[in-house]
């Protein structure tokens, strides 16, 4: 039974909220962001019928984590995106508390969405349904309904289906929490997307030597890359280390061998996917030219998100830039999408003076052991020395300084700046640090320890969703 439509309220929220968001000095000029309300996980990232599609978790009615819809953008070139009709709203009993994250597939020429229907009970507790929806001729979507109930042996925290085709079968990984409150990744297979068979647990507590690795693993994504398979996921509750896993919830990757017949993934150690302050729930897709692309939510659940100043203008959060993945000699590399170079203006050398903070790309070559720093408007500071990088940012709740770290020999930095975000690519993508920051309109980028001949920058043209 369908619930009452909230579409009129959503349209009113967009009409009233969009002008405020676009006038905000912190609103991005070339990243994806909501025109009103709260945005979080990227969903359904796919190339289909000559277009790229990126769906995302969106609450258009408030800047909080209620009423999760699937909003939708599309593009022909990965640079210029346009708004599409809302794909999914929580208007059925099986998804009444949110159309949670998932993926998209091409099912014999039909764009099909696989998502989690979230249901919370008045007396406490919850359940989850894995659901399907298919695209109509007019670009809207028709819900098929649940195809997989809550698996036996797990709490109501089972979600985020990532589905793909291999040979004659569909496969799905799900993030899960077992009844002992331990994080797991589950594997299922199907011949038709409707009837699913459990193939067991492939990662998490008690698997491949892992012990205390969190109480819930979210947003899994398993894919081949180079000579290995890569599993990306978000282990909630993993123990903090002195300089690693410092965010409220981190995102990690692990490489290994995946056996389809046995339903087994033999992987190595966990690695943090992004060492910055804001990065979560990444999702990948394979392009027709063979590239594995990634996009993440430049946010973190809880933490200080509800103190961000954009709340005053009715919007919160943005996506990362799109990234290309490679796996070389045991290392996962993330590089900025090559198409982003089309946004560059004229190349500039550096005179040694401060630069006005504005959307730009910086290319900085370093010598191992160089001591240097970049100060982003007195709000965010990047320091480099022989041990690696330290990113410092003042808390939004107090005057306390918070830090994030990347350790290793720094040879080069590519820094991508937008109105309220910085993404730092280290050594050609060997490491990444992604962070939000909220400078004054007159903020400047200042430098220390940098020689002009090692520095080049390009202003970046505005390229907003239409």
From Swiss-Prot:
Positions of the catalytic residues: 41
Positions of transmembrane segments: none
Pfam families attached to this UniProt entry: Glyco_hydro_32C (PF08244), Glyco_hydro_32N (PF00251)
Pathway assignment: Glycan biosynthesis; sucrose metabolism
Location of the protein in the cell: Cytoplasm
Record-listed substrate binding positions: 38-41, 57, 100-101, 159-160, 218
GO CC, one annotated term: cytoplasm
Key words, A-Z: Carbohydrate metabolism, Cytoplasm, Glycosidase, Hydrolase, Plasmid
Its EC number(s): 3.2.1.26
Catalytic activities: Hydrolysis of terminal non-reducing beta-D-fructofuranoside residues in beta-D-fructofuranosides
Main location: cytoplasm
Cysteine pairings via disulfide bonds: none
GO molecular-function term, one example from the UniProt record: beta-fructofuranosidase activity
One BP term from GO: sucrose metabolic process
Enzyme class: hydrolase
NCBIfam families from the UniProt entry: scrB_fam
Protein family (similarity comment): Belongs to the glycosyl hydrolase 32 family.
Biological role: Enables the bacterium to metabolize sucrose as a sole carbon source.
Protein's recorded name: Sucrose-6-phosphate hydrolase
Natural source organism: Salmonella typhimurium
Gene designation per UniProt: scrB
């Amino acid at each position: 039974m369908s619930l009452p439509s909230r579409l009129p309220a959503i349209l009113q929220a967009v009409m009233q909220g969009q002008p405020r968001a676009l006038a905000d000095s912190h609103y991005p000029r070339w990243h994806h962001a909501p025109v009103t309300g709260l945005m979080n996980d990227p969903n359904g990232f796919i190339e289909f019928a000559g277009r790229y599609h990126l769906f995302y978790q969106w609450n258009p009615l408030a800047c909080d984590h209620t009423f999760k819809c699937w909003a939708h953008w599309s593009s022909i070139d990965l640079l210029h995106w346009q708004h599409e009709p809302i794909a999914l709203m929580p208007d059925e009993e099986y998804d009444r508390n949110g159309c949670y994250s998932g993926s998209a597939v091409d099912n014999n020429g039909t764009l099909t969405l696989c998502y989690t229907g979230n249901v919370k009970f008045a007396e406490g507790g919850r359940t989850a349904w894995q659901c399907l929806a298919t695209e109509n001729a007019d670009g809207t979507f028709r819900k098929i309904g649940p195809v997989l109930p809550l698996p036996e042996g797990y709490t109501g925290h089972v979600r985020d289906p990532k589905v793909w085709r291999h040979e004659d079968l569909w496969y799905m990984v799900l993030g899960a929490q077992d009844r002992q409150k331990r994080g797991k990744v589950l594997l299922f297979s199907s011949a038709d997307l409707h009837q699913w068979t459990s193939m067991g647990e492939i990662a998490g507590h008690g698997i491949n030597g892992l012990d205390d690795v969190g109480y819930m693993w979210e947003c899994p994504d398993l894919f081949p890359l180079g000579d290995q398979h890569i599993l990306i996921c978000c282990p909630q509750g993993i123990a903090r280390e002195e300089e690693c896993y410092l965010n409220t919830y981190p995102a990690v990757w692990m490489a290994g061998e995946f056996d389809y017949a046995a339903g087994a993934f033999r992987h190595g150690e966990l690695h943090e996917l992004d060492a910055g302050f804001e990065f979560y729930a990444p999702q990948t897709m394979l392009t027709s030219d063979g590239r594995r692309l990634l996009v993440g939510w430049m946010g973190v659940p809880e933490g200080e998100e509800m103190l961000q100043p954009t709340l005053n203008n009715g919007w919160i959060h943005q996506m990362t830039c799109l990234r290309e993945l490679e796996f070389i000699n045991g290392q996962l590399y993330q590089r900025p999408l090559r198409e982003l170079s089309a946004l560059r203006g004229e190349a500039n050398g550096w005179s040694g003076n401060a630069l006005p903070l504005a959307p730009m790309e910086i290319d900085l070559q370093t010598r191992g052991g160089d001591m240097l720093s970049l100060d982003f408007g007195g709000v965010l500071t990047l320091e480099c020395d022989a041990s690696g990088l330290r990113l410092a940012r003042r808390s939004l709740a107090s005057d306390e300084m918070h830090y994030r770290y990347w350790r290793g020999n720094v040879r080069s930095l590519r820094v991508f700046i937008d109105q309220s975000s910085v993404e730092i690519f280290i050594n050609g993508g060997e490491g990444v640090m992604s962070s939000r920051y909220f400078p004054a309109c007159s903020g400047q980028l200042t430098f220390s320890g940098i020689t002009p001949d090692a520095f080049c920058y390009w202003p970046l043209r505005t390229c907003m969703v239409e």
